[in-house]
Amino acid sequence: MSGRGKGGKGLGKGGAKRHRKVLRDNIQGITKPAIRRLARRGGVKRISGLIYEETRGVLKIFLENVIRDAVTYTEHARRKTVTAMDVVYALKRQGRTLYGFGG
């Protein structure tokens, strides 16, 4: 392995880091019909127009919390890939146990 440690580049010098596209306003990708379908699944018949932005805000906060915890588990295990189990443990930590994804 030539002393590069776990996951080191094999040949060459490794190359420059590629710039990632800055992600913003992706919450608008949760479309009005998608929110409507979730509400229908929950048994809602009629939806106020103000609900959509509010739902996006609540969903964003919820996902930020879950992802933060999942990434913490990943970093503690010294991995770079977030696994399904990291997400399951993150949800369990917040009192929302999820079944069906191992563990």
UniProtKB/Swiss-Prot annotation:
DNA-binding region, residues: 17-21
This protein's record includes keyword DNA-binding: yes
Species this chain originates from: Arabidopsis thaliana (Mouse-ear cress)
Any one GO MF annotation of this record: structural constituent of chromatin
Record note on quaternary structure: The nucleosome is a histone octamer containing two molecules each of H2A, H2B, H3 and H4 assembled in one H3-H4 heterotetramer and two H2A-H2B heterodimers. The octamer wraps approximately 147 bp of DNA. Interacts with ORTH2. Interacts with AHL27.
Major site of localization recorded for this protein: nucleus
Gene Ontology cellular component terms for the protein in this record: chloroplast; cytosol; extracellular region; nucleolus; nucleosome; peroxisome; plant-type vacuole; plasma membrane
Entry's localization field: Nucleus; Chromosome
Recorded family membership: Belongs to the histone H4 family.
UniProt entry keywords in alphabetical sequence: Acetylation, Chromosome, DNA-binding, Nucleosome core, Nucleus
Function in brief: Core component of nucleosome. Nucleosomes wrap and compact DNA into chromatin, limiting DNA accessibility to the cellular machineries which require DNA as a template. Histones thereby play a central role in transcription regulation, DNA repair, DNA replication and chromosomal stability. DNA accessibility is regulated via a complex set of post-translational modifications of histones, also called histone code, and nucleosome remodeling.
GO process terms (BP): response to water deprivation
Gly residues bias: start-end ranges: 1-14
SUPFAM superfamilies, A to Z: Histone-fold
PTM comment text: May be acetylated by MBD9.
Classification via Gene3D superfamilies: Histone, subunit A
Protein name according to UniProt: Histone H4
Region Disordered: start-end pairs: 1-20
